[in-house]
Amino acid sequence: MRKPVMTVLFGLLLCISFSCSKDEKTEPSGDDAEVPPMKESYPGLSVSSSGELLLNGEPYQGIGVNYFNGFTRTLEDGSLYDDTYRAGFTYLKERNIPFVRFSLTGFWPKNWDLYLNQKEKYFRSLDSFITAAEEIGIGLIPSFFWHTPTLPDLAGEPVNRWGVTSSRTHQLMRKFIREVVVRYRDSPAVWGWEQGNEVNLLVDLPGDNSNLPPVVPSLGTPVSRSKEDKLQTADLNVMMTSFAKEIRKYDGTRIVISGNSIPRFAAWNLLHQKQWTPDSREQYVAILGIQNPDPVNVLCIHAYPAAPSEGYFSDETADFNGLIRASVDASRISHKPLFLGEWGAQETEYGAQTRTKFMEILNAIENNQVPLSAMWVFDYPPHDTENGINVSPDNGPREYMLQEIMKVNERMANR
């Protein structure tokens, strides 16, 4: 889910995550030659040769939550030692919520200041976050580059340099991946690595001067954008394959996730025909594979219920359950387990029917045996009123959402 500018500014500074105790970490220099050798396997989630999701070597199904600013809140001015995430982790653990997905880096270029200028403090804060997850028993899926334009902006390049492996953007990406993965790869709290958030919604959009990334110079963006700040599927392919290959230099087993949303309703036709023609079910399955290229080894979507009049495919009537069924079918074809990285029911849209809609989504997840999913969103106050979708100790009426997830997690564990 993309955040409005002011909401993101409020909730989204820098982010990284994981850890072991300080004396167990291995911090790489800028030279790969000094990185300690990679182990045969690491804790967390992996994928079997047949495409089955495993946790520490055993088949796994589970539903977690998005703890979007769980770490980034600590990087706001005066909040470096804010450890309220400990209470959040404990609250989730008591409800059998096994893992969280969260933003690992700053949304805007300005939000990278701590990492760029006071790296030791940045990692000290992240160490504390990871250690808390280890102690309380919460798994972590960090999303590295939540706002796609930010890394190129920091590198002083247009956004489409994500599609050029020799770019400064990729150089910065590789450096950051090395520092994070080598530092935290031994942590049992780390379950997987995710590239970013909904990059696929940015590709193949028509027009040279439309659908451009936002411009907020006070937060570090350029003063203007051009057609070079737009992405194509070819750029996405380079982004994802390069990210996954870099992860594999230092961690050969954990899952690597794109962080993609459900493809746009015309994604296949935008790629091949440059037209907003709705995709068929077959085209939807095909574009999922294209947008989650090897060595990314998970199919990722973010999905919220469509209006009954919209549907999902041009050639059949499909409700949310039908969408999930098609996505699971695609995952079996590709031998990549499905990660429904965001899902939820918004009170601002469904009102008194929110609980019914929530259960419809949850039933689709359970009935289709989706191996991994994460509800949007936990303990993110801006979405209390903006979307009516936040679940936290402060809004008791939505506690039922975690209670229902807990029941499904218990049934999944007992199968």
Predicted segments with their positions:
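Aromatic-rich peripheral "rim/lid" segments of glycoside hydrolase catalytic domains that contact
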Residues: 168, 350-415
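Bacterial N-terminal signal peptides that target proteins for export
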Residues: 1-8
